[in-house]
């Protein structure tokens, strides 16, 4: 049962500054009690830039000492503050400096030692996941970048908590197609190495365009080079809260337009964001580190009533993937951003609505029923906060086709000046109509059909870099 000691008076955020009426305070309490509102993740960013060295044992020792020193109290502090306010904090995580930079001087075979040191340190401090086995290669590779990408499959198949991410494109640099090709192969090999778990290793690997430096969500979190020595970034949740508010308004009998529904989502996002910032500032103050950002993203779970898909159904869609799905998602994403931006001046990360298929019951069911295709999901990613996320595809899909899917999604991000990402899971030995089970927050996914296999090899094989887009001619 949640603690009754949850009070706004004890926080540094006064009632006057929140501009909340008594009714809105009551609604916030209801959101916590019965509508699945939680803080999805408190992520501590830790700089490892001072951990570089000439040998793997030296680097590993420095990394472990740094993480133990910075993060030893993270979990206990989060639990204390969760109890104080009665607000669940689901995950406690770490994000570190991109390891490609930290381990630059090491040989490729030594990167696995570094990854295992990260995994051990994460286990010792009690966090769920550690992000930052990462490289930024949108314009080209360093030696360390290549070593890191080469070792991703082995690292993700032999560690429990380490997550990997690679930025292969940006609006200013274009798309590094050599990196895209390598990541297609890395995804396939990671899948094969974790075939006994339905390719689960790929759930810890994200390929990005315009990768944010302060994202608290896994598997794409890392500590950017412009970030402080250590910093708290928080990701809130709340699809269930938004759904309940929409249902309450729709069932009131009033004549509502989509503009009215957008306003309801906006007000709800405001309340959710205030809760997230309260927790973030309290944790940062208790740990003596900087407060960074609140990520506004509506992150679903496999739990009934905690689904972005259910929100789209509330907005009038009989099936997710039907005509109108992209417009409904655009409405939701924009309203969430507007409400959150009004609630906090420290909004960052991804901030919008996620559509991770395996982690959302309604999206997964839409795939099973044949209503939601890969092509429709790609269209929807042009207006939401992330991309093709947690999508299980047949194990027979070749590496070049995977790379071509990556390239398509990167192009959406590059041209539209937004973050896009791909987390595809080729499931070895399974095909359309079968199901992959990942467990926990990762949920389960019905295998999605990928059409036109083995028809993109020549395109991917050209390699090189797709140039950055012109910005003066906006159409």
PLM-predicted stretches and their roles:
Residues 15-475:
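Anaerobic metallocofactor- and corrinoid-dependent redox/one-carbon enzyme cores
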């Amino acid at each position: 049962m949640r603690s009754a000691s949850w009070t706004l008076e004890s926080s540094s955020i006064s009632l006057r500054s929140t501009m909340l009426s008594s009714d809105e305070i009551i609604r916030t309490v209801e959101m916590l009690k019965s509508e699945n509102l939680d803080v999805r993740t408190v992520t501590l960013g830790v700089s490892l830039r001072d951990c570089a060295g000439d040998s793997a044992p030296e680097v590993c020792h420095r990394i472990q000492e740094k993480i133990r020193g910075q993060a030893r109290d993270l979990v206990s502090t989060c639990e204390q503050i969760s109890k104080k306010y009665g607000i669940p904090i689901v995950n406690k995580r770490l994000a570190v400096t991109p390891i490609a930079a930290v381990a630059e001087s090491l040989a490729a075979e030594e990167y696995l030692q570094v990854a295992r040191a990260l995994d051990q340190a994460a286990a010792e401090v009690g966090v769920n996941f550690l992000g930052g086995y990462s490289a930024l290669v949108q314009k080209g590779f360093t030696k360390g970048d290549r070593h890191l990408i080469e070792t991703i499959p082995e690292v993700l198949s032999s560690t429990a908590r380490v997550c990997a991410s690679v930025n292969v494109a940006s609006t200013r640099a274009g798309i590094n197609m050599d990196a895209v090709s390598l990541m297609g192969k890395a995804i396939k090999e990671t899948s094969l190495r974790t075939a006994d778990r339905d390719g689960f290793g790929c759930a810890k690997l994200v390929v990005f365009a315009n990768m944010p430096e302060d994202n608290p969500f896994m598997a794409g979190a890392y500590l950017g080079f412009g970030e402080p020595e250590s910093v708290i970034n928080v990701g809130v949740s709340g699809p269930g809260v938004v759904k309940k508010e929409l249902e309450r308004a729709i069932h009131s009998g009033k004549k509502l337009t989509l503009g009215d529904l957008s306003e309801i989502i906006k007000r709800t996002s405001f309340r959710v964001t205030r809760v997230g910032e309260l927790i973030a500032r309290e944790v940062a103050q208790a740990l003596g580190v900087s407060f960074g950002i609140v990520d506004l993203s509506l992150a679903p779970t496999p739990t009934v009533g905690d689904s972005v898909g259910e929100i789209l159904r509330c907005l009038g869609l009989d099936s997710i993937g039907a005509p109108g799905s992209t417009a409904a998602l655009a409405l939701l994403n924009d309203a969430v951003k507007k409400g959150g931006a009004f609630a906090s001046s420290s909004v960052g990360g991804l901030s919008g609505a996620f559509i991770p298929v395996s982690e959302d019951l309604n999206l997964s069911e839409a795939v099973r029923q044949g209503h939601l295709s890969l092509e429709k999901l790609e269209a929807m990613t042009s207006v939401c906060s992330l991309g093709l996320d947690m999508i299980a595809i047949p194990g027979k899909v070749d590496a070049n086709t995977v790379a071509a899917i990556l390239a398509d999604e990167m192009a959406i991000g590059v041209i539209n000046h937004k973050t896009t990402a791909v987390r595809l899971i080729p499931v070895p030995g399974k095909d359309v109509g079968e199901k992959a089970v990942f467990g926990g927050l990762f949920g389960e996914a019905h295998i999605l059909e990928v059409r036109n296999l083995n028809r993109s090899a020549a395109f991917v094989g050209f390699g090189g870099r797709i140039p950055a887009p012109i910005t003066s001619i906006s159409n």
